[in-house]
């Protein structure tokens, strides 16, 4: 039986993770693994924080803290963020574990023993001002390949090419910004050229994504050169040699980080009491293991060229039980880049969607759904707040959530929550059941091909089919004439609901669990669909998804982007919203004083910031005012708005005429406080649909910015009486 060793790129423990990281490596890996588990496959999903990279040292120096403090903080931060967004690692560890130190040093010594390392005296970047050697990331300059400025000395973020400080144009110290010099230093290099032909032949045989395979073969064709695997740095894994010129030197993180996949697997099986089980996944014992690395575009050369070379350089692993070659990567389904509103994510400018912040405002399933629907599988894609809102509301809420709620509400209302017997099937009924089977087959195939965006679309197509089936069958009509026919419709609708509960598990695990709960199922989900039996009792449903609102998006931009990067917040807010709408949210969420202070910080001179009551009075003529028809009415019914959290739908008696009004009073009045109240309404206001419900007038109320109070006559008067 094939077994899967699935990894996701080890995130640097120097800061939080953002939506670009999630869409690039972690969400696709999680979808793939969740599907394999549903299929009953043998799969282990491993990840952990990379805790020795120069980004950690860089942040520690900037913040005058120790690297240990930095990695301890962000290991927990990143781990929690992954848990909140429901990334289901079997184990999430860290490269500061002793097993990782031991294994990394072992890889170094084996490569040295096998003749693949060479010691060289070379010139290393050195800052005369700060009196220290500079790791590649501590050097910035212009990329010689694409001309991008302010690129680090290890890799160009624009074209993705590996770099060294020596080839940068006008290299400078990243801290003091002074030009650097180069001093002699002794280091070990791996002879990458010795693996060139073997790597080329190995990669040519792979059925990898074209964007990965073509990029890697292109680099190899240009020729591989010796690359340093030790460096002058005081934070990292010490070089395991008692040599004078190796004192105070550590293993290069790009050498030891991928070894973390193995060391973390060893740690995982040790913790679950199976200390030798890791060998089945990392050693080629029977040819049945598929090692799959999910990464972002910037990690392709390290995983597809250098990492396989390290495994080859080690040679055979041998202990008292086994002797075998290492498993080389079976597949590397790297994704391209995710941009934000047309621009590259920038952590330094806070031009990013940080996962922990986004989940403070929106559910995890919303982020998972949107990112999967735009996943940059073969080309770059863009995160747009407008598109996010549209996709959530028009697809997740109106299609998927609507169908599940309709089917479950109907069976509870007309069949006491009991799955009805199925009568004779017509052509559409049979087509519905065929759609279920076809969707499972197609979605599974697409997931195995790493086409997660198309797979999710197929799932949503089934939900859309369910809605169309329900509409065509019109059970709300047939229930009055033919309960048996209606029972068949509802039975099949519930089969689609159950199918969705399974199909959504890889993509939207929270929604999947809710559907399973609504269906009152205790069986373990599997990819093999079995029907709900007639007579099974289901629960009453709740709303599966609530609409994403402009207020939520404004709040997110204000509270998170606005605090650290006011210019970025202003750019987004001006792109989508009127200033008065932003002001309303700011004052509602942060209070009068703090809200206006925040708006002045973001909009500067564009925001005048008058408090309520301070605005200059604007007059209307008596003729204009006399056009307004104000009437006395009585509230006779109060209902929650079906599509909005802050609105009521109220019915007002104007004396022989009942008007339906939409009122934003939910925050200020309970339904029972409004019922039977006399109110003043604008009776000749043009009707307008508010969130799908037509409002035939407007209630009048006083608003001081904190409290809202309805205007009411101080004694009972005839309903419909004019206010003059």
From Swiss-Prot:
UniProt GO BP: methionyl-tRNA aminoacylation
Main location: cytoplasm
GO function term, MF aspect, one: ATP binding
EC number: 6.1.1.10
Keyword flag Transport: no
Species assigned in the record: Pyrococcus furiosus (strain ATCC 43587 / DSM 3638 / JCM 8422 / Vc1)
Keyword Ligase among UniProt keywords: yes
InterPro entries xref list: aa-tRNA-synth_I_CS, Anticodon_Met, Met-tRNA-synth_bsu_C, Met-tRNA_ligase_1, Met-tRNA_synth, Methionyl/Leucyl_tRNA_Synth, MetRS_core, MetRS_Zn
Entry keyword set: Aminoacyl-tRNA synthetase, ATP-binding, Cytoplasm, Ligase, Metal-binding, Nucleotide-binding, Protein biosynthesis, RNA-binding, tRNA-binding, Zinc
CDD domains referenced in this protein's UniProt entry, alphabetically: Anticodon_Ia_Met, MetRS_core, tRNA_bind_EcMetRS_like
Residues noted as binding ATP in the record, renumbered to the chain: 347
Catalysed reactions, semicolon-separated: tRNA(Met) + L-methionine + ATP = L-methionyl-tRNA(Met) + AMP + diphosphate
Enzyme class: ligase
Motif ('HIGH' region): 11-21
A Pfam family assignment: tRNA_bind
Cellular component terms per the entry's GO annotation: cytosol
Motif 'KMSKS' region, residue numbers: 344-348
tRNA-binding domain boundaries: 624-724
Subcellular location as annotated: Cytoplasm
Function field: Is required not only for elongation of protein synthesis but also for the initiation of all mRNA translation through initiator tRNA(fMet) aminoacylation.
Gene3D superfamilies, alphabetized: HUPs, Isoleucyl-tRNA Synthetase, Domain 1, Methionyl-tRNA synthetase, Zn-domain, Nucleic acid-binding proteins
UniProt name for this protein: Methionine--tRNA ligase
């Amino acid at each position: 039986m094939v077994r899967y060793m699935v990894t996701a790129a080890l995130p640097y423990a120097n800061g939080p993770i953002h939506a670009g990281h999630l869409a690039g490596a972690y969400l696709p890996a999680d979808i793939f693994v969740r599907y394999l588990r549903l299929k009953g496959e043998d799969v282990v999903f491993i990840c952990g924080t990379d805790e020795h990279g120069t980004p950690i040292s860089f942040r520690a120096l900037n913040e005058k803290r120790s690297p240990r403090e930095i990695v301890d903080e962000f290991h927990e931060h990143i781990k929690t963020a992954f848990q909140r967004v429901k990334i289901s690692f079997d184990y999430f560890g860290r490269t500061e574990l002793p097993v990782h130190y031991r294994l990394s040093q072992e890889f170094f010594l084996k490569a040295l023993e096998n003749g693949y390392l060479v010691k060289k005296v070379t010139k290393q970047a050195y800052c005369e001002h700060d009196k220290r050697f500079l790791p590649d990331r501590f050097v910035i300059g212009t990329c010689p390949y694409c001309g991008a400025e302010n690129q680090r000395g290890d890799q160009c973020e624009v074209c993705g090419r590996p770099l060294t400080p020596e080839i940068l144009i006008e290299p400078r110290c990243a801290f003091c910004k002074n030009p650097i010099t180069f001093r002699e230093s002794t280091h070990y290099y791996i002879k990458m050229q010795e693996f060139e032909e073997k790597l080329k032949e190995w990669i040519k045989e792979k059925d990898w994504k074209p964007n990965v395979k073509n990029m890697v073969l292109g680099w190899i064709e240009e020729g591989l050169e010796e690359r340093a695997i030790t460096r002058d740095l005081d934070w990292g894994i010490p070089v395991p040699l008692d040599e004078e010129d190796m004192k105070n030197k550590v293993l290069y993180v790009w050498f030891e980080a991928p070894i973390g996949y193995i060391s973390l697997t060893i740690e995982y099986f040790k913790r679950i009491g199976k200390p030798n089980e890791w060998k089945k996944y990392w050693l080629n014992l029977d040819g049945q293991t598929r090692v799959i690395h999910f990464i972002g575009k910037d990690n392709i050369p390290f995983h597809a060229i250098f990492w396989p070379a390290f495994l080859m350089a080690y040679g055979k692993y041998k202990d008292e039980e086994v002797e075998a070659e290492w498993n080389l990567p079976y597949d590397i389904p790297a994704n391209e880049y995710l941009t934000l509103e047309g621009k590259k994510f920038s952590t330094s400018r806070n031009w990013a969607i940080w996962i922990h912040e986004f989940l403070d405002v929106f559910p995890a399933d919303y982020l998972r759904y949107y990112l999967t629907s735009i996943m940059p599988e073969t080309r770059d894609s863009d995160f747009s707040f407008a598109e996010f809102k549209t996709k959530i509301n028009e697809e997740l809420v109106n299609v998927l959530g609507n169908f599940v709620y309709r089917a479950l509400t109907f069976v509870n209302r007309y069949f006491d929550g009991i799955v009805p017997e199925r009568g004779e099937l017509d052509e559409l009924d049979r087509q519905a059941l065929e759609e279920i089977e076809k969707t499972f087959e197609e979605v599974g195939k697409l997931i195995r091909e790493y086409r997660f965006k198309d797979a999710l679309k197929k799932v949503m197509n089934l939900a859309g089919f369910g809605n169309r089936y329900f509409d065509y069958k019109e059970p709300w009509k047939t229930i009055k004439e033919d309960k048996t026919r209606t029972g068949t419709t509802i039975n099949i609708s519930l089969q689609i609901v159950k199918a969705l509960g399974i199909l959504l598990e890889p993509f939207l695990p929270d929604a999947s669990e809710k559907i399973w709960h609504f269906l009152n199922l205790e069986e373990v989900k599997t990819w093999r669909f079995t029907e709900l039996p007639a007579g099974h009792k289901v629960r009453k449903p709740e709303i599966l998804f609530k609409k994403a609102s402009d207020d939520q998006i404004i709040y997110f931009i204000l509270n998170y982007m606005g605090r650290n990067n006011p210019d970025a917040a202003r750019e987004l807010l001006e792109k989508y919203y009127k200033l008065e709408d932003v002001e309303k949210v700011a004052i509602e969420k942060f209070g009068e004083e703090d809200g206006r202070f925040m708006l002045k910080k973001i909009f500067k001179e564009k925001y005048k910031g008058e408090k309520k009551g301070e605005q200059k009075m604007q007059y209307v003529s008596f003729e204009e005012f006399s056009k307004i028809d104000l009437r006395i009415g009585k509230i006779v019914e109060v209902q929650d708005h079906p599509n909005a959290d802050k609105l009521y739908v109220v019915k007002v008696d104007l004396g022989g005429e009942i008007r339906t009004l939409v009122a934003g009073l939910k925050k200020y009045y309970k339904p029972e406080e409004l019922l039977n109240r006399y109110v003043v309404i604008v009776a000749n206001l043009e009707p307008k649909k508010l969130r799908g419900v037509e409002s035939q007038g407007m209630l009048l109320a006083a608003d001081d910015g904190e409290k809202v109070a309805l205007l009411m006559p101080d004694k009972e008067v005839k309903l419909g009486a004019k206010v003059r």
